Amino acid sequence: MKITAIIPARYASTRFPGKALAEIIGKPMVQHVYERTAKAGLVSEVIVATDDERVAEAVRAFGGRVEMTSATHETGTDRLAEVAARIDADIIVNVQGDEPLIEPAMIDEAIAPLVADASIRMGTLKSRIKSLHDFLSPNVVKVVTDREGDALYFSRSPLPNFRDKWNDLKDEAFVTGRLLCYKHVGLYVYRRDFLLAFARMAPTPLELAEKLEQLRVLENGFRIRVVETSFESIGVDTPSDLDKVVEKLSRFQI
């Protein structure tokens, strides 16, 4: 079984232009993501997908594989699908290009269910929400699952919504930890044919309302297996996020 990890990496960014090439301890960010992804035990190969020659040159400079894509894609999924359509692979892993601290074990955790069960078409990760701030923040996507671990819904709103006894339930969740709430970790794994089919599906009402592409999958009646991970990463959306990553890498010499 061939498992290919694709890292979509754009140069343009509204909040942080050029972040894919931002230097972190002597290397561009995209190189950190590439090297850590390559350490995942289940990954056969790693490819950077970009529409910018500056990013492509940086990847070639450290010996990585790069595929050029159209500059007109509206989503990262579309960019991923363009590359997936022209390569030979059984499973495609979408690793965000702004996650320089991603743990290789996280990638393996997300891949494992698709290797073990041929009926699973798509997978992703979740981790425990540990603060009320994150639970209430629309920037933190929440997820609830069924007993098998398949997603029931993703939302920017609090999930679940505590109708009664809010203060008691809040303490259960965020003080005692007996009631678990989860946030979505944006790493996706697809069977190649399902990814290509997903990219052809029209946007759906809930997807457009929440601005969450994965809801398109649920609205079309497909399952997403969600695996809990204990690992934490830091997504780089702003220069201040980059400072946090640099500080952590410097301190622990990761």
Swiss-Prot record:
Lineage: Bacteria, Pseudomonadati, Thermodesulfobacteriota, Desulfuromonadia, Geobacterales
Functional summary from the UniProt entry: Activates KDO (a required 8-carbon sugar) for incorporation into bacterial lipopolysaccharide in Gram-negative bacteria.
Family indicated by similarity: Belongs to the KdsB family.
Pfam families, per database record: CTP_transf_3
Compartments, record wording: Cytoplasm
Gene of this entry: kdsB
Molecular function (Gene Ontology), one example: 3-deoxy-manno-octulosonate cytidylyltransferase activity
Name under which the protein is recorded: 3-deoxy-manno-octulosonate cytidylyltransferase
Enzyme superclass (EC): transferase
